[in-house]
C-alpha cells in the first residue's frame, strides 16, 4: 500500500518495485509482478537483476522469448560472472530450441555456480537433448546431491533412470 501512494517524481529507487515484484510473483500474482518489474526497468533500464528476473520469468511462462533473450544477453554483458544470470540466458536458448548454443552457456553457468541444483539440472537437460547422455546423467546426479526439494528430487531421479523428453516449443 505504501508503494502505491508514492508520487512518481519521488520514486528514485528501482529496488522498491523489484522487491515488490518478487513478492507478487511468489504470491502467484504475475500480472502485478510484471508491472512492477517493468516499472523498475523504467527507473533503471540497465539493472541486470531486474532484466534477469523479468526475462527468466517470461521464458519460464513461455512468453516473449525474443525480448527475453535480448534482455538476458544484456544482463550477461553487465554481469558476466553471475552464474544465475548466465544460466537464465542458457535456459532461454534451450527453451527457444537453440540446444547447441545453449550447452556452452549452461556449462559456463555450472562452472560459476557449482553448488546450484537447478543450474546443474538445466545443463543435464541440455546435454541429454544434444545426445550427450552420460554427461547428462552425471549432471543430474550432481543436481540430485544438491537438491532439498522432494518434488525436484523425484523428477531428477526419474531423469537419471529414464532420460529426458525435451519439451515442445
Where are these regions (language model features)?
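Residue-level detector of the short coil/turn that links helix A to helix B
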Residues: 28, 62-63, 97, 131
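Position-specific recognition of the canonical hydrophobic site in helix A of tetratricopeptide repeat
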Residues: 25, 59-60, 94, 128
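Structural marker of alpha-solenoid helical repeat scaffolds
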Residues: 5-9, 43, 78, 112, ...
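Canonical tetratricopeptide repeat
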Residues: 19, 53, 88, 122, ...
Amino acid at each position: 500500500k505504501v508503494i502505491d501512494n508514492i508520487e512518481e517524481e519521488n520514486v528514485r529507487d528501482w529496488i522498491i518495485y523489484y522487491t515488490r515484484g518478487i513478492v507478487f510473483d511468489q504470491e502467484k500474482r504475475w500480472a502485478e509482478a510484471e508491472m512492477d518489474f517493468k516499472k523498475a526497468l523504467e527507473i533503471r533500464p540497465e539493472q541486470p537483476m531486474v532484466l534477469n528476473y523479468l526475462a527468466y520469468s517470461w521464458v519460464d511462462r513461455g512468453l516473449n522469448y525474443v525480448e527475453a533473450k535480448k534482455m538476458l544477453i544484456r544482463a550477461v554483458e553487465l554481469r558476466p560472472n553471475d552464474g544465475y544470470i548466465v544460466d537464465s540466458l542458457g535456459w532461454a536458448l534451450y527453451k527457444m530450441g537453440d540446444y547447441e548454443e545453449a550447452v556452452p552457456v549452461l556449462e559456463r553457468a555450472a562452472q560459476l555456480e557449482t553448488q546450484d541444483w537447478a543450474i546443474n539440472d538445466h545443463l543435464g537437460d541440455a546435454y541429454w537433448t544434444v545426445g550427450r547422455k552420460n554427461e547428462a546423467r552425471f549432471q543430474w546426479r550432481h543436481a540430485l546431491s544438491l537438491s532439498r526439494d522432494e518434488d525436484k528430487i523425484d523428477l531428477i531421479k526419474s531423469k537419471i533412470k529414464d532420460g529426458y523428453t525435451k519439451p515442445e516449443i
